[in-house]
Curated annotation (Swiss-Prot):
Alphabetical UniProt keywords: Plasmid
Key word Mitochondrion present: no
Family of the protein in this entry: Belongs to the short-chain dehydrogenases/reductases (SDR) family.
Protein's name according to its UniProt entry: Inactive 2-(S)-hydroxypropyl-CoM dehydrogenase 2
GO molecular function per UniProt: oxidoreductase activity, acting on the CH-OH group of donors, NAD or NADP as acceptor
A single BP term in Gene Ontology: fatty acid elongation
CDD domains: SDR_c
Pfam families per record: adh_short_C2
Gene3D superfamilies listed in its UniProt record: NAD(P)-binding Rossmann-like Domain (3.40.50.720)
Entry annotated with the keyword Ligase: no
Length: 230
């Protein structure tokens, strides 16, 4: 995602709970990137990280909220602690990062926010109660933000990826041991005949951040190989 943004001409701030990881990734990208550690569920930490990014790179014009965690469990089996953790990272994290970014965007009357949902926020997936609920909340929050802020120069959209097999999330969904039968069953749900790639998802987000999407706001952008079409 960050590399795609830099290729498009942007400067990027990478914020991760693991500060060393964020700094290492930024160093690998080069001078156009800056990395810092912050927990998206900590309001003070994420606000400080945003302020640091603006000092390092200049005014914030785009935000990608792609911090997220998944988990497995039905309503009757999910522990309250698991439910709370999934909601905190996926929903509260999106809220807090957006809140931190919006003050400057509103002052400048310019900005684009891309939230990350999931096909799990659009359709029901067995044994993923908390994750489906969290990503559904992100979709609804995106629509609310678009309705409220688009007239003030700030567009808000949500990308809802299908399975991306090469990511940690994709490996969770397919099983750590890449069960061929499970993979085949999941693949059968994708009319395009393959799972997504990180590049597929990144290019969708970069489009929504760009001026090419100047008339796009409140959009639920399913990047899912047709999964939700059937």
């Amino acid at each position: 995602m960050a590399r795609a943004a830099v290729r498009a001409g942007a400067k990027v701030a990478l914020i991760d709970r693991d500060g060393a990881c964020a700094e290492k990734a930024a160093a690998e990208i080069g001078a156009a990137a800056w990395g810092v550690g912050a927990d998206v569920t900590d309001e003070a930490a994420i606000a400080a990280a945003m302020a640091g990014a603006e000092r390092a790179l200049g005014p914030l014009t785009g935000l990608v909220n792609n911090a997220g965690i998944a988990g497995f469990g039905s309503v009757h089996t999910t522990e309250v602690e698991t439910w709370g953790r999934i909601m905190a990272v996926n929903v509260t994290g999106t809220f807090l990062a957006s809140k931190a970014a919006l003050s400057g965007m509103l002052e400048r009357r310019r900005g684009a926010i891309v939230n990350f949902g999931s096909v799990a926020g659009l359709v029901g997936i067995p044994s993923m109660a908390a994750y489906c609920a969290a990503k559904g909340a992100v979709v609804s929050l995106t629509r609310q933000m678009a309705a409220e802020y688009s007239g003030q120069g700030i567009r808000v959209n949500v990308v809802c990826p299908g399975t991306v097999a090469s990511t940690d999330m994709g490996r969770q969904l397919l099983g750590q041991d890449a069960d061929p039968e499970l993979e085949a069953r999941r693949l059968a749900k994708y009319p395009i005949g393959r799972f997504g790639t990180p590049e597929d998802i990144a290019e969708a987000a970069i489009f929504l951040l760009s001026t090419k999407a100047a008339f796009v706001t409140g959009c639920v952008f399913a990047v899912d190989g047709g999964m939700t079409a059937i």
